């Protein structure tokens, strides 16, 4: 089996199972007759670009980092002037008096990975489920500036 076929198998396993460790991936591969070293598996996972996310119970699992549509409505980008991130929190800067409007838009979008928002006059704090999600949202919002 070549590298490309092996990486396709890894992607298939990740999509089909809720897997949290490289050891679990390695065991799934072995069940399918594919033997890999830890170094090869680590390299494959890095090349595939897997994300490690948390589920509702707080357990880590691997997820494909396939591009997904933006979770934000187009109106959200209209109000954002600047995006900063501190760990799992985003700070969105707006014009004076627009932060509460932006908070309402984000809250109405009901994005599962956003736990809540707190608005000031021109600054909005967005609390994300974890740091990886905050990074993804930061990148998404910054791309629209």
From Swiss-Prot:
It is found in: Cytoplasm. SUPFAM superfamilies: C-terminal domain of arginine repressor, Winged helix' DNA-binding domain. GO terms for molecular function: arginine binding; DNA binding; DNA-binding transcription factor activity. Keywords: Amino-acid biosynthesis, Arginine biosynthesis, Cytoplasm, DNA-binding, Repressor, Transcription, Transcription regulation. The keyword tRNA-binding does not apply. Pfam families: Arg_repressor (PF01316), Arg_repressor_C (PF02863). Its main location: cytoplasm. GO terms for biological process: L-arginine biosynthetic process; protein complex oligomerization; regulation of arginine biosynthetic process. Pathway: Amino-acid biosynthesis; L-arginine biosynthesis [regulation]. GO terms for cellular component: cytoplasm. InterPro entries: Arg_repress, Arg_repress_C, Arg_repress_C_sf, Arg_repress_DNA-bd, WH-like_DNA-bd_sf, WH_DNA-bd_sf. Regulates arginine biosynthesis genes. Belongs to the ArgR family. This is Arginine repressor. It comes from Streptococcus pyogenes serotype M1.
């Amino acid at each position: 089996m070549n590298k490309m076929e092996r990486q396709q198998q890894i992607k298939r396993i990740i999509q089909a199972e809720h897997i949290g460790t490289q050891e679990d991936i390695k065991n799934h591969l072995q069940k399918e007759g594919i033997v890999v070293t830890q170094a090869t598996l680590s390299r494959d996972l890095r090349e595939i670009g897997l994300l490690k996310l948390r589920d509702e119970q707080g357990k880590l699992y691997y997820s494909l980092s396939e591009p997904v549509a933006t979770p934000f409505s187009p109106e959200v980008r209209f109000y954002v002037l600047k995006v900063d991130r501190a760990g799992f929190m985003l700070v969105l800067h707006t014009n004076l008096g627009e932060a509460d409007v932006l908070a309402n838009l984000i809250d109405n979008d009901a994005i599962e990975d956003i736990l809540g928002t707190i608005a000031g006059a021109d600054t909005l704090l967005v609390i994300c489920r974890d740091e990886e999600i905050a990074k993804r949202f930061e990148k998404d919002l910054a791309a629209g500036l």
